[in-house]
């Protein structure tokens, strides 16, 4: 693809998201979503092959359905309230449709089926964009209407997402699908605390984006897309593989690392609001995610797979492109836990 066209498409995707985030008018929000969707399709199909075309088609159909439901909810709310501004939703049917449409855009369960399939069919760079930037617009709208959302509906979808995100990743060997199921589980954690505290949701989103960005940059750096290819990276780039192991454990929420902080703060916030059973179930279900992260860390760093090369280390490393942002992302995705007291005072 022509670099100028590709840059224009990326800028349009970002402009659409920005329009959604800064707007208080429902029509502008819908236009922002459509801008974002139409520019995202060619980005997903940058590597033009049947798998990418199929993934882009699935993404388009899902997002178009969600946009249709969103517009229907907006019109129903307009009939009852007579205004286009984002205020309290006056009609429960409109509110339910709105929540379902945004859940479909986010990839929350039970509308999650498109996320692993689309992520698997596209490149790692497009997958990074899909699992990070594309979450901003729907979550920003959910944060703005959080006071009107039915908490039982939101918590049910959140719990299902955490469960599906853990179960779905257990038997996977494709790293992109594992990252997709990880994304579904993280979205579940974010939306679980949404009815109680939107600041906590935003904080969790920022840490999730940092960890996912670091992980995808490591995968792009090592060109690994399966667990088998990941197991051979130790011979080629031991430092990158070690960093990958720590980042994976952070994504699983292991205590000394950054990924533990949002889980800790979300459970604390929910128990403050006299919700005990839900956070207990969430914490237990998070062990599923931790299991497959630890399995990946074990296979990548702690085992030496059979190789035709008898040397433990290659004397000449492959030439790889420098990623100047990578050290910063690694530090942020592993060492932010000591900042918990300062961040918890933001509520």
Swiss-Prot record:
Q: Which reaction does it catalyse?
A: a ubiquinone + NADH + 5 H(+)(in) = a ubiquinol + NAD(+) + 4 H(+)(out)
Key words of the record: Electron transport, Membrane, Mitochondrion, Mitochondrion inner membrane, NAD, Respiratory chain, Translocase, Transmembrane, Transmembrane helix, Transport, Ubiquinone
Report what the protein is called: NADH-ubiquinone oxidoreductase chain 2
Subunit note: Core subunit of respiratory chain NADH dehydrogenase (Complex I) which is composed of 45 different subunits. Interacts with TMEM242.
The record's listing under InterPro entries reads: Complex_I_Subunit_2, NADH_DH_su2_C, NADH_UbQ_OxRdtase_chain2, ND/Mrp_TM
GO cellular component terms, semicolon-separated? mitochondrial inner membrane; respiratory chain complex I
An example GO biological process term is: reactive oxygen species metabolic process
Report the domain of life of the source organism: Eukaryota
The principal location of this protein is mitochondrion
Q: What is the lineage of its organism?
A: Eukaryota, Metazoa, Chordata, Craniata, Vertebrata
């Amino acid at each position: 693809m022509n670099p100028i066209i590709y840059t224009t498409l990326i800028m349009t995707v970002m402009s659409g998201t920005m329009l959604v985030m800064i707007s208080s008018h429902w029509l502008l929000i819908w236009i922002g979503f459509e801008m974002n969707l139409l520019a995202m399709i060619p980005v997903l199909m940058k590597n033009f092959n049947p798998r990418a075309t199929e993934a882009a088609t699935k993404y388009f159909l899902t997002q178009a359905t969600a946009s249709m439901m969103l517009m229907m909810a907006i019109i129903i709310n307009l009939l009852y309230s007579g205004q286009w501004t984002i205020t309290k939703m006056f009609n429960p049917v409109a509110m339910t449709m709105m929540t379902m449409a945004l859940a479909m855009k986010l990839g929350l369960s039970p509308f999650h089926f498109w996320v692993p399939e689309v992520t698997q069919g596209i490149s790692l760079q497009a997958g990074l964009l899909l699992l990070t930037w594309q979450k901003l617009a729907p979550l920003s709208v959910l944060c703005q209407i959080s006071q009107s959302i039915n908490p039982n509906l939101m918590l049910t979808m959140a719990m299902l997402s955490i469960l599906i995100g853990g179960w779905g990743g257990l038997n996977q060997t494709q790293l992109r699908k594992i990252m997709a199921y990880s994304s579904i589980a993280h979205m579940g954690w974010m939306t679980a605390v949404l009815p109680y505290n939107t600041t906590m949701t935003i904080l969790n989103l920022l840490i999730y984006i940092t960890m996912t960005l670091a992980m995808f940059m490591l995968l792009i750096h090592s060109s690994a897309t399966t667990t088998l290819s990941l197991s051979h990276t130790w011979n080629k780039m031991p430092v990158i593989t070690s960093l990958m192991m720590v980042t994976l454990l952070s994504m699983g929420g292991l205590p000394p690392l950054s990924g533990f902080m949002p889980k800790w703060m979300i459970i604390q916030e929910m128990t403050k609001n006299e919700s005990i059973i839900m956070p207990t179930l969430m914490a237990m279900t998070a062990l599923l995610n931790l299991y497959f992260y630890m399995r990946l860390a074990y296979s990548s760093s702690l085992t030496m797979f059979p190789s035709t090369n008898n040397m433990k280390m290659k004397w000449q490393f492959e030439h790889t492109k420098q990623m100047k942002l990578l050290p910063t992302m690694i530090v942020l995705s592993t060492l932010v836990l000591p900042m918990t007291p300062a961040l918890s005072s933001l509520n």
